[in-house]
Amino acid sequence: MSRARISNYRKGVAAVALSAALAGAFVVTGPLGALNEARAEAVHVTPPPQAGFADLVEKVRPAVVSVRVKKDVQETSNRGPQFFGPPGFDQLPDGHPLKRFFRDFGMEPRGDSRSDNRRGKANKPRPGHERPVAQGSGFVISEDGYVVTNNHVVSDGDAYTVVLDDGTELDAKLIGADPRTDLAVLKINAPKRKFVYVAFGDDNKVRVGDWVVAVGNPFGLGGTVTSGIVSARGRDIGAGPYDDFIQIDAAVNKGNSGGPAFDLSGEVIGINTAIFSPSGGSVGIAFAIPSSTAKQVVDQLIKKGSVERGWIGVQIQPVTKDIAASLGLAEEKGAIVASPQDDGPAAKAGIKAGDVITAVNGETVQDPRDLARKVANIAPGEKAALTVWRKNKAEEINVTIAAMPNDKGKSGSQSNDNDGGQGETLDSYGLTVVPSEDGKGVVVTDVDPDSDAADRGIRSGDVIVSVNNQTVKTAGDINKAITAAEKSGRKAVLLQLQSNDQSRFVALPINQE
């Protein structure tokens, strides 16, 4: 074949190949367009096996109840001005739903203008009757109808009604209440009925970030379910000496008090008790009593109707950074004994003012609140080994736990009539002091408002009893104690103060110039 023919043959083949390629391109374009149209269809996602809490709620909800509380009201008369009812109440027509609502709750208009005929017997003194005063939530913990709720829900009541999830209303009686932990137990009056109930779980296994489900009766609406997570542990909200709340962000509102917070196993890990809210509604900050605390209290309330706690009889305060430095402690942990109560268990065992209790039965004490809880959980009559820090070393003291006595309010303050004369000035601390009349310590007569002493709350009239656990009677004794502390390398000195029959410790930094 000549070169010319070969060249023409190659050109022909190339042309055919190009035509085929173009044809193929058009063939492929059709299906690609169809694929694009398929991709425009709605996306369908298969849900995970556990998409919600419906199964859990279905099982636990029958055990959650609403609690209605009523109180006996003394004889009243409808004549004259009334103190209940909103402005404009008397302008509402008879039969108006709001008027019926307020009257159902014992509220009457200010100056009811109805005629005597329309009042019927209402113009006569009404006999004592029960008026609703509170409502909250609770949950059944036994087949025979024991119900756990909050003390603040039932504390003002004389009669109690429990409303089950199906709407059944049953009378109940108060078995016992514990204001210190804000817990109470009711017993439903239905001896032949077997109730669905829930169990307490172990809140010590609950971690921050775990799911929780809250069930309750917000605003009296009836069984309502919300969910959230554990936001924090060990919260102290100033409600009492045993504060140790679990913080959750599930929606909790008024009326949820006493209701349960469940883990995903359907066990109660907390009792919803309080919320933090500037508006009165839920802002995602709720507090629940841990189940470990509740179980101990509830068991005692059912058995005895009251709670008996361990007690050692000490006034305690936190170990601050300055106090730790003044005592040679490596950590700001424990509780310093401001004063042991005369003839109390601690005093009898040899616990002294200035001792720092760092452990109970080998368990570290974090702070005064932790010490109070640990001691309270020990049965009266048992012995407890307290580890105390005294004179730069730890030692163990056995204390026989007693039952906590009933609170006795301390009356009035005690004034100090010592005019102090001229007094001596401790220039480095901005204090002027004079010896006390009974020879026990020195009395502070003046405090420089710009001094460290003023910043730490020392005031005129306070009595300095000791410095670094050394008794003092003069300003010279104080200076000697400060000098000794400085030579030993301490950065602060510990003052024991007495005021209004109360003892406390204050650490002042040593001014090293």
UniProtKB/Swiss-Prot annotation:
Query: Species name for this entry?
Result: Brucella abortus (strain 2308)
- Which GO CC terms are listed, alphabetically? outer membrane-bounded periplasmic space
Q: Which residues form the active site?
A: H152, D182, S257
Family as reported in the entry's similarity comment: Belongs to the peptidase S1C family.
Q: Show the segment(s) annotated as Serine protease.
A: 125-299
Q: Which SMART domains match?
A: PDZ
In short, the EC number is 3.4.21.107
Q: Which Pfam families match?
A: PDZ, PDZ_2, Trypsin_2
Alphabetical list of PANTHER family matching this protein: SERINE PROTEASE FAMILY S1C HTRA-RELATED, SERINE PROTEASE HTRA2, MITOCHONDRIAL
Region Disordered, annotated ranges? 100-135, 403-428
Q: Taking every annotated instance into account, which residue ranges of this chain make up the domain PDZ?
A: 300-391, 414-500
Question: Tell me, what does this protein do in biology?
Answer: Might be efficient in the degradation of transiently denatured and unfolded proteins which accumulate in the periplasm following stress conditions.
Q: Which GO biological process entries does UniProt record here?
A: proteolysis
The protein's UniProt keywords, in alphabetical order, are: Hydrolase, Periplasm, Protease, Repeat, Serine protease, Signal, Stress response
List the catalytic activities from the record. Answer: Acts on substrates that are at least partially unfolded. The cleavage site P1 residue is normally between a pair of hydrophobic residues, such as Val-|-Val
Protein name as it appears in the record? Probable periplasmic serine endoprotease DegP-like
User: Where in or outside the cell?
Assistant: Periplasm
Signal sequence span is 1-25
Q: Which domain of life is it from?
A: Bacteria
Quote the Gene3D superfamilies the UniProt record gives: 2.30.42.10, 2.40.10.120
